[in-house]
């Protein structure tokens, strides 16, 4: 599958800061969670870590392009209900009638929007850890049968 990066939009879902205390003070490192998608059925996510935020985002985008999945979209929504659990995060996805819009909270919204789904109902249950919610959403979307 040939991927043209120009067609893809990227959204930074989360930026985390990790502090290491050393004798001379504090050392900061950053991690970035990024979702990429072409709004036409292709979506992926990546995690990047670096000493500076822009470097972490660049690494995350590169990682996201290695993890792209194809989502089976039926019109403007999905074909059937699906529930998926990843670690302590659980996501519930339900098809919605046309004109409903994307009803999704937190980290699940960018994944669904970048996948090109326009009408869907979602509920995030359990842990709201951004990485786990994004991973659960992507895993759920990849399991949808056409």
Swiss-Prot record:
GO terms for biological process: translation. It holds the Pfam family Ribosomal_S5_C. Belongs to the universal ribosomal protein uS5 family. GO terms for molecular function: rRNA binding; structural constituent of ribosome. One of its GO terms (cellular component) is small ribosomal subunit. InterPro entries: Ribosomal_Su5_D2-typ_SF (IPR020568), Ribosomal_uS5 (IPR000851), Ribosomal_uS5_bac-type (IPR005712), Ribosomal_uS5_C (IPR005324), Ribosomal_uS5_N (IPR013810), Ribosomal_uS5_N_CS (IPR018192), Ribsml_uS5_D2-typ_fold_subgr (IPR014721). The gene is rpsE. Keywords: Ribonucleoprotein, Ribosomal protein, RNA-binding, rRNA-binding. With S4 and S12 plays an important role in translational accuracy. The keyword RNA-binding applies. The N-terminal domain interacts with the head of the 30S subunit; the C-terminal domain interacts with the body and contacts protein S4. The interaction surface between S4 and S5 is involved in control of translational fidelity. Part of the 30S ribosomal subunit. Contacts proteins S4 and S8. Residues 8-71 form the S5 DRBM domain. The keyword rRNA-binding applies. Disulfide bonds: none annotated. This is Small ribosomal subunit protein uS5.
């Amino acid at each position: 599958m040939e991927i043209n990066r120009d067609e893809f939009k990227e959204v930074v879902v989360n930026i985390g800061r990790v502090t290491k205390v050393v004798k001379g003070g504090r050392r900061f490192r950053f991690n970035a969670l990024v979702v990429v998608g072409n709004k036409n059925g292709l979506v992926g996510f990546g995690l990047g870590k670096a000493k500076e935020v822009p470097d972490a985002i660049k690494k995350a985008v590169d990682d996201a392009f290695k993890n792209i999945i194809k989502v089976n979209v039926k019109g403007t929504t999905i074909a059937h209900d699906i529930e998926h659990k990843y670690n302590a995060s659980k996501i519930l996805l339900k098809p919605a009638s046309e004109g409903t819009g994307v009803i999704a909270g937190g980290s699940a919204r960018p994944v669904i929007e970048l996948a090109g789904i326009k009408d869907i109902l979602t509920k995030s249950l359990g842990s709201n850890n951004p990485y786990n919610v994004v991973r659960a959403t992507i895993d759920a979307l990849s399991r949808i049968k056409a």
